[in-house]
Amino acid sequence: MAVLWFDGLLARVADAGVYFLPEDDVDELLEAAAVNRFPCLRVNLAGCTGKADLLLRIAGVFAVPPHVVQDWDQLAPALERLRLADSAGQVLVLEHSEDLRAAALGEFKAAMEALQAVSADWAARDLAFWSFVVLDETQFDALG
């Protein structure tokens, strides 16, 4: 994909949500986020095997004390408090999710639903919250 494609996509608040992203497209996404002046945070999920660890890693990249986000329903309010006032959007990139998907697929799905809810909440205020789960191209078929 091209930076121009991502640039246009990120500007469309109504389309913001959770998406799977091929590894080869990460650099273009990061560049498009910079063009749009959207903060882009990356979460390395290598070795992550459950909800508590996942929430801890997300809290860590947002520099939120771990006790602030201990469940999915606490995620949206925490992220809203951290939103930069002059930014029309935010990009979250989740990388190396293989271990989590293998060990706790239900928690992975719950996380995606929570992030989708954050996107919907932000979109209601004309703000874009994008989440991208980076996958190797061969993993797309396994998602079903």
Show which residues each predicted segment covers.
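Positively charged, polar, low-complexity stretches
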Residues: A2-G144
